[in-house]
């Protein structure tokens, strides 16, 4: 079973609804709860569909794959997405939180975590026609 958890802190200077909007820009299929201190969401691998498409369009699958594999632990992995960029409908995948306002933490669990990583961010370092 696949499980996706997302959490984004809400700082005192931020509007919780805007933080929720940032999360939904990247994960439109996610069920979220907007609270004063954080936006939290849960879903399954289907909630990653939009992210998968964006990674392909922006040609950052290999970067994302490297981060996902670096943080691989048993049947889970995690990464961050820049919250400010997400509000502007952009995806910047991060190894660690770098923004003073905090970034969106994404945690993924799966019985087949490598299969999920291969789907979300396939290894595109070798073109398919060369690999054969």
UniProtKB/Swiss-Prot annotation:
Coiled coil: none annotated. Pfam families: RNA_binding (PF01877). InterPro entries: PAB1135-like (IPR002739), Ribosomal_uL5_dom_sf (IPR022803). Belongs to the UPF0201 family. PANTHER family: UPF0201 PROTEIN TK1335. This is UPF0201 protein MTH_433. It comes from Methanothermobacter thermautotrophicus (strain ATCC 29096 / DSM 1053 / JCM 10044 / NBRC 100330 / Delta H).
């Amino acid at each position: 079973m696949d499980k996706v958890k997302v959490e984004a802190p809400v700082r005192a200077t931020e509007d919780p609804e805007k933080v929720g909007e940032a999360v939904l820009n990247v994960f439109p299929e996610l069920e979220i709860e907007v609270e004063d201190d954080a936006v939290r969401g849960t879903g399954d691998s289907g909630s990653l569909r939009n992210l998968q498409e964006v990674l392909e369009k922006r040609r950052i699958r290999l970067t994302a794959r490297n981060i996902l594999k670096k943080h691989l632990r048993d049947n889970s992995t995690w990464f961050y997405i820049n919250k400010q960029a997400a509000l502007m409908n952009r995806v910047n995948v991060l190894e660690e939180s770098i923004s003073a306002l905090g970034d969106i933490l994404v945690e993924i669990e799966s019985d087949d975590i490598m299969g999920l990583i291969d789907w979300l961010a396939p290894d595109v370092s070798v073109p398919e026609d060369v690999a054969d």
